[in-house]
Amino acid sequence: MTDASHPTAADDLGALSTLFRSEQGGHERVLLCQDRESGLKAVIALHSTALGPALGGTRFHAYASDEEAVLDALNLARGMSYKNALAGLPHGGGKAVIIGSPAPVSEGGLKSEALLRAYGRFVASLDGRYVTACDVGTYVADMDVVARECRWTTGRSPENGGAGDSSVLTAFGVFQGMRASAQALWGEPTLRGRTVGVAGVGKVGHHLVDHLVEDGARVVVTDVRPESVERVRARHPRVVAVPDTESLIRADLDVYAPCALGGALNDDTVPALTARVVCGAANNQLAHPGVEKDLAGRGILYAPDYVVNAGGVIQVADELLGFDFDRAKAKAAQIFDTTLAIFDRARTDGVPPAVAADRIAEQRMAEARTV
């Protein structure tokens, strides 16, 4: 279903409607949103509500075209369906994108209280079928503003009834996936004595380094922001820094952890990898279909990104229950068992782990539809 969501917006949103009809790919609903007064133009995509209300963040980005924005919303919503299913959450998958610069109006961007509140009203119009949260370009303070118009908002500040920053549990979940990978490959659920390369030590990556150092791993890092590397090395002086990702993937690693941009595993990086395991926090690590087969062909064990980085969505889902950190952490700890189950399914089916993960998620969604 497609909605033209503002009575004066039909001409501006007509192209987006055409794009949606041609690209919808099984999505249940897409809401095309426009508020001319605030400058809001957004897409809310609901991929599946088989397991419950769709849950996924709001991305605020200056897309090169409306087509790119629509496709991103559709792809991200689908990914959230799979992530939520494998995390064992009572939620389907959805995602929203706000089109434009996420900088404040005072800095030449589009972000303003009026725009965020207008967006919140569109989310509210879905009457609980979509629950939103932070994503790229949106932050806890933004969710506080959205929540003034919409009670189906997570990722809020603790002062406003939320759980705050989810990077701590995201990193914890990635660490559990890494422990499971070590168990599957080396027979022990520890990184002690292993060399782990972390690409990106920002919000999630620096917490992951904390876990690795505590576990006894040797850690090598890189980041495009020197200050992020300096912060990590100030906390952990034995951490080694290299100048760029290319240097990192060619280093003598046991585990490679992409924790920055998507597309980290591609036709250039996979042949250069020395690591036996890839397990990181970045979204959409596989640059295109088929990369997972290239990894398997080289004997590299890949822990699917949307499985191991689910700690963040586990946190925001728990926020709907009245956030309890210990309860959410216990749920995120289950990423260890889920990752092992995926590796077992991959061996049984003779497929790469990414394919096995998809099959398990699809099975859970299909079973929910028949109940």
UniProtKB/Swiss-Prot annotation:
Reactions the enzyme catalyzes: L-valine + NAD(+) + H2O = 3-methyl-2-oxobutanoate + NH4(+) + NADH + H(+)
Pathway the protein acts in: Amino-acid degradation; L-valine degradation
The residues that hold NAD(+) are G200, V201, G202, K203, V204, G205, H206
Tell me the domain of life: Bacteria
The active site annotation covers K95
Quote the cellular component terms of the Gene Ontology held in the record.
Answer: cytoplasm
Q: Which GO terms describe its molecular function?
A: valine dehydrogenase (NAD+) activity
Gene3D superfamilies with a match to the protein in the record: Leucine Dehydrogenase, chain A, domain 1, NAD(P)-binding Rossmann-like Domain
One biological process term from GO is: valine catabolic process
EC number(s) of the enzyme? 1.4.1.23
User: Cytoplasm: is it a keyword of this entry?
Assistant: yes
Q: What is its main location?
A: cytoplasm
The answer to whether the entry has keyword Oxidoreductase is yes
Q: Can you state the subunit structure given in the record?
A: Homodimer.
The protein's job, in short, is: Oxidative deamination of branched-chain amino acids. The catabolism of valine is the major source of fatty acid precursors for macrolide biosynthesis and a vital source of antibiotic precursors.
Regarding protein family, the annotation reads: Belongs to the Glu/Leu/Phe/Val dehydrogenases family.
How is this protein named in the record?
Answer: Valine dehydrogenase
Organism, by scientific name, is: Streptomyces fradiae (Streptomyces roseoflavus)
Query: What does the record give as the organism's lineage?
Result: Bacteria, Bacillati, Actinomycetota, Actinomycetes, Kitasatosporales
Q: Which gene encodes it?
A: vdh
